[in-house]
Amino acid sequence: MVFFMSRGLPSNKTYDPVFANNDWAAIIDACHANEVPDTWVSDGSCYKDMDIGGKAYRIDIIGKNHDDLADGTGKAPLTCQMHDCYDTTYQMNSSNTNAGGWRDCQMRTQTMPALKALLPAEVQSRIREVNKLTSAGNQSSIIVTTSDEL
């Protein structure tokens, strides 16, 4: 699972150099202010737990200024993924194929929005769409761009 946060105006706050020592409000503020410390991605501690439904899930930073924002305004300050996602296994499609590719699959159109709704409200409201390149599916070599939040 990947999520992205917006960028915006500078802040006058300081952030703990260890990613996990910051609360989600501070992480969101750093992203919004485009002031994500380099140490968050370089010191080996680029993960933090997030409480979802009473269970802690590990969230890892997998990119800084890597993904293009779908609205064309620049790069997403952070790209994160969830570790050990959920205890439930989900299919890409009910047919057990990748027909239709990522853009049209059940995982993207139904499952991901349902999973987003389980995230803490303060995080949900700061997730922004980015462009991701994916296969058109069904053994196609065509690459398509999708705008994704998760």
List the model feature ranges, each with a label.
Residues 3-150:
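Collagenous Gly-X-Y triple-helix signature in extracellular proteins
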